[in-house]
UniProtKB/Swiss-Prot annotation:
One Pfam assignment: ATP-synt_DE_N
GO cellular component term of the entry, any: plasma membrane
Self-association and partners: F-type ATPases have 2 components, CF(1) - the catalytic core - and CF(0) - the membrane proton channel. CF(1) has five subunits: alpha(3), beta(3), gamma(1), delta(1), epsilon(1). CF(0) has three main subunits: a, b and c.
Taxonomy of the source species: Bacteria, Bacillati, Bacillota, Bacilli, Bacillales
Localization of this protein: Cell membrane
Protein name: ATP synthase epsilon chain
Family the entry assigns: Belongs to the ATPase epsilon chain family.
Keyword Transmembrane part of the UniProt annotation: no
Record's keyword annotation contains Ligase: no
Membrane topology (UniProt): Peripheral membrane protein
InterPro entries the record matches: ATP_F1_dsu/esu_C_sf (IPR036794), ATP_synth_F1_dsu/esu (IPR001469), ATP_synth_F1_dsu/esu_N (IPR020546), ATP_synth_F1_esu_C (IPR020547), ATPsynth_dsu/esu_N (IPR036771)
Keywords on record: ATP synthesis, Cell membrane, CF(1), Hydrogen ion transport, Ion transport, Membrane, Transport
Amino acid sequence: MKTIHVSVVTPDGPVYEDDVEMVSVKAKSGELGILPGHIPLVAPLEISAARLKKGGKTQYIAVSGGFLEVRPDKVTILAQAAERAEDIDVLRAKAAKERAERRLQSQQDDIDFKRAELALKRAMNRLSVAEMK
């Protein structure tokens, strides 16, 4: 089966690099499925799970926003943060979720509320992806 090369990169360095059969991500415009030979595309990503299919198995990566760049032979995910399902520290993610929930319940200005809301989304995404491994 044809494959496409995928790189998931964060400011801290590469998180994943391999050839896969299909990449599925959630862009701001909706779900995208990328196969080898896909037309060039750049899309902003939501906080969500990237699904990488290879050999009948699916690997999951928690992606905290960023951008997707697609070329016919390569997909690059540039994310602020990304973690493979098996690398997620569930206890740390649960603590981050609880911290964000407490910040949301306290009365704060709009900027802090928005930051707490994003922190909660990131923590919930990490927990969701950790369960998929």
